[in-house]
Every structure is written in structure tokens, then in C-alpha cells.
């Protein structure tokens, strides 16, 4: 097994990027080889550790992966769907693995990334949290036992800056439940309700979205019957939980061949 892996972090100056840098410094099996920011940023040349508030790490922020091609083996990417596709293409052409925590991909972008996985080791997950990945397993059980006779609603909340809605985690929750029940999420999902609506169909899965303040991430799946309801909830209080999960994924990916993996495999929750 690999003892230590060298990583690069894209979007190094963002909220998640700085948290990833901090997590890398605290991880004994991770070595930060590079941190990348967009061209023209005033932070180019700044020490990544000092930027993240964890002390100097002797890694200067650079504006191109090409400048750091010899400094890392695995890229950790929490940027935007468009940027993540570009970064995955770069990794595919340069013999690098990649951990993708970006959300908001459309179907075509997901297919592009899957194609790159034919020659590139990729971990792609809408949520790197251990607790969230365990929640998905609990949702499978709840859907098996209660899904056919309850009304299912998914409620999620994030900070005011989050751009995609519903969150990737919420959509994954819906996908997990729909798969167990033999439903097509694209056909049974209901995104918000307004005005006078018809009586709720039990075949649907509802989604509600909250964007407010500095919420890190809260997700609830509700299985509601007459007289009782089951709620399965995960609340994140710090981005560090996602960053630590990304480091765990990067370390695991260091021993894997080409393929498209997810956090369930990283955590040993499925083959």
C-alpha cells in the first residue's frame, strides 16, 4: 500500500480550497505538491499554507497545472462542472488521477468524465462525508421497508453562495431511493410546489431547497405515512468533514487502476 500520496488542489483560494489545503497539512499520508488558482489572480505566488492560515508549506500558488506537472500524482478538484471536465481531461492526458467533489454536472458532462475513466483513476462523489455515505445505505433500507406506502420528501439547506440546486447530495439521495423502488427519478421528482396543486401522488419524490446564511450542509429524507414518519438527517457543521473525506479518497486512489469510483468504494461500503 502507498505510504504517502502527492496531491494538487485546484481552486486553492476558495472556501473549500483553503479547507482542503488545511486538511492536506494535517494528513500524515498526504503531501501537498501544488495548489492552483485561475490565471490573473492576485494570489499567484502566495504560499498555500499561509493563504489557508496554517503556516508556510513552501508551496506557492500557481496559475496552471502545466507548471506543476512534476509535483503531484493526484488532483483534488472542487471547482465548477465546466472546470472539472477540463481538469479531468488534463489528468487523462498527463497520467494523473483525480478526486472530484464538484457538483452540478449535467448528463453530458458526467458522460465525458466516465469516458476519461477508461484510462484514468477517478473518484467522483457529490459528498465526501463518511456520515453522508452511511446515510445513503440507511436510505436503501428505509426505502425497502417503507418506500412503497409513504410520501417521500427530501429537504436540503446550504449557504447563500451555493449555486446548484438541489444539491448533488440531495439528488443522490433521490437516486438511491428511486433505484430501490424501481422508479426513474427524472420522471418522479417534483422540485418545489407553488399555488394550487393536485393531491400528492405517492409515486413522486419531492425536493425542497434552502439557501441561507452560512449553512454548511443539511439533508433530510422524510418517509411520511398517516400517523408516523421516519426522518433520516445529516448535518455538517464544518467543511473539514468534506476535505478529510477527499484526502481519504486521494490516499485510496493511489493504489487503484483506471476506473470511475465513488466514496462507497473508498469506504468499503460496496465492491
Swiss-Prot record:
Protein name in the entry: 4-hydroxy-tetrahydrodipicolinate reductase
Residues bound to NAD(+): 11-16, 37, 101-103, 125-128
Cellular compartments per GO CC: cytosol
Reaction catalysed by this enzyme: (S)-2,3,4,5-tetrahydrodipicolinate + NAD(+) + H2O = (2S,4S)-4-hydroxy-2,3,4,5-tetrahydrodipicolinate + NADH + H(+); (S)-2,3,4,5-tetrahydrodipicolinate + NADP(+) + H2O = (2S,4S)-4-hydroxy-2,3,4,5-tetrahydrodipicolinate + NADPH + H(+)
Purpose: Catalyzes the conversion of 4-hydroxy-tetrahydrodipicolinate (HTPA) to tetrahydrodipicolinate.
Catalytic residues in the record: 158, 162
Alphabetic keyword roster: Amino-acid biosynthesis, Cytoplasm, Diaminopimelate biosynthesis, Lysine biosynthesis, NAD, NADP, Oxidoreductase
Functional pathway: Amino-acid biosynthesis; L-lysine biosynthesis via DAP pathway; (S)-tetrahydrodipicolinate from L-aspartate: step 4/4
Disulfide cysteine pairs (residue numbers): none
PANTHER family found in the cross-reference section: 4-HYDROXY-TETRAHYDRODIPICOLINATE REDUCTASE 1, CHLOROPLASTIC-RELATED (PTHR20836:SF0), DIHYDRODIPICOLINATE REDUCTASE (PTHR20836)
Residues given in the record as NADP(+) binding sites: 38
InterPro entries the record matches: DapB_C, DapB_N, DapB_N_CS, DHDPR_bac, NAD(P)-bd_dom_sf
Gene3D superfamilies linked: Dihydrodipicolinate Reductase, domain 2, NAD(P)-binding Rossmann-like Domain
Cellular localization per UniProt: Cytoplasm
GO BP annotation list: diaminopimelate biosynthetic process; lysine biosynthetic process via diaminopimelate
Species in which this protein is naturally found: Shewanella loihica (strain ATCC BAA-1088 / PV-4)
Highest taxon of source: Bacteria
Amino acid at each position: 500500500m502507498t505510504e504517502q500520496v502527492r496531491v494538487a488542489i485546484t481552486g486553492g483560494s476558495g472556501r473549500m480550497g483553503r479547507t482542503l489545503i488545511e486538511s492536506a497539512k494535517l494528513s500524515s499520508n498526504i503531501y501537498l505538491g501544488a495548489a492552483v488558482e485561475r490565471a490573473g489572480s492576485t494570489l499567484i505566488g502566495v504560499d498555500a499554507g499561509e493563504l489557508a492560515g496554517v503556516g508556510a508549506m513552501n508551496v506557492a500558488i500557481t496559475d496552471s497545472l502545466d507548471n506543476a506537472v512534476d509535483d503531484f500524482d493526484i488532483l483534488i478538484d472542487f471547482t465548477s462542472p465546466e472546470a472539472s471536465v477540463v481538469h479531468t481531461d488534463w489528468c487523462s492526458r498527463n497520467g494523473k488521477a483525480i478526486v472530484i467533489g464538484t457538483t452540478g454536472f449535467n448528463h453530458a458532462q458526467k458522460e465525458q468524465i466516465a469516458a476519461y475513466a477508461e484510462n484514468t483513476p477517478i473518484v467522483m462523489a457529490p459528498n465526501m462525508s463518511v456520515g453522508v455515505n452511511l446515510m445513503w445505505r440507511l436510505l436503501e433500507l428505509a426505502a425497502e421497508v417503507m418506500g412503497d406506502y409513504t410520501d417521500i420528501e427530501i429537504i436540503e439547506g446550504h449557504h447563500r453562495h451555493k449555486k446548484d440546486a438541489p444539491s448533488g447530495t440531495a439528488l443522490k439521495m433521490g437516486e438511491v431511493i428511486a433505484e430501490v423502488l424501481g422508479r426513474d427519478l427524472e420522471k418522479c421528482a417534483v422540485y418545489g410546489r407553488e399555488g394550487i396543486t393536485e393531491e400528492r401522488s405517492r409515486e413522486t419524490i419531492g425536493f425542497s431547497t434552502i439557501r441561507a446564511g452560512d449553512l454548511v450542509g443539511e439533508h433530510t429524507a422524510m418517509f411520511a405515512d398517516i400517523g408516523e414518519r421516519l426522518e433520516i438527517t445529516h448535518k455538517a457543521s464544518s467543511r473539514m468533514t468534506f476535505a478529510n473525506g477527499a484526502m481519504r479518497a486521494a490516499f485510496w486512489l493511489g493504489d487503484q487502476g483506471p476506473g470511475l469510483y465513488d466514496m462507497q468504494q473508498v469506504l468499503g461500503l460496496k465492491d
